[in-house]
């Protein structure tokens, strides 16, 4: 199960944390055993994972120019995590492919260097896209318990409160930066993408609030 700062939903759902600017892999076995393959900065977070997991260090999952001591081939790390040749192996990214051409099980949205390593470790013919297990029509994340619903409602409320706060403060002469600063709250990541623009949007390709 793959995760990075922009594609952390499935990874974070099971581990409780996102790997920020590093890549990360959660390897789950049928018997419940788990391993987390992570970079330098996330080794300390493995002990806090919701799913108890063995920590396996992969230095090149780290940011560029960080220490690379102890690096080993990724396929070797995957085998240590439990990926075995000839065993059916599911690779979970973040996107559910819904094409009608019958090839979705062999489309992968995970970085190619990781996909290729998984295929080398398990055998290319034994690797399939398994994202549907989490976000498919009958996926685990499609059913929410009361606690999850409360968290999603909290995120939704923060987002809508931010919009109301900005709308009520709107007055002539305010800049996009001033209004944009009202869209987030409580130091939380917003559950939607915040956009604050006035007048012609995307001037010179800029997508972010300015001081105009």
Where do the language-model regions lie?
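N-terminal accessory/capping or targeting/presequence segment of soluble
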Residues: 1-72, 76
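Charged, often glycine-rich, active-site loop that binds/positions anionic groups
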Residues: 11-16, 141-148, 209
């Amino acid at each position: 199960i793959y995760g990075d700062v922009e594609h952390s939903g499935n990874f974070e759902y099971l581990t409780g944390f996102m790997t920020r600017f590093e890549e990360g892999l959660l390897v789950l076995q049928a018997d419940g055993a788990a391993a987390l393959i992570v970079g330098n900065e996330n080794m300390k977070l493995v002990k806090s994972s919701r799913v108890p997991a063995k920590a396996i260090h992969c230095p090149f999952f780290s940011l560029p120019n960080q220490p690379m001591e102890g690096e080993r081939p990724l396929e070797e790390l995957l085998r240590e995590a439990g990926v075995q040749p000839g065993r059916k192996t599911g690779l979970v990214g973040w996107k559910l492919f819904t094409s009608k051409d019958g090839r979705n099980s062999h489309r992968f949205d995970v970085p190619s260097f990781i996909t290729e390593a998984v295929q080398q470790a398990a055998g290319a013919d034994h690797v399939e896209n398994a994202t549907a297990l989490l976000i498919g029509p009958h996926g685990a994340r499609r059913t929410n318990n009361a606690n999850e619903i409360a968290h999603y409602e909290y995120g939704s409320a923060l987002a809508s409160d931010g919009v109301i706060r900005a709308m009520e403060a709107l007055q002539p002469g305010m800049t996009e930066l001033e209004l944009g600063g009202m869209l987030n709250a409580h130091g939380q990541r917003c559950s939607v993408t915040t956009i604050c623009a006035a007048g012609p949007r995307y001037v010179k390709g800029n997508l972010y609030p300015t001081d105009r």
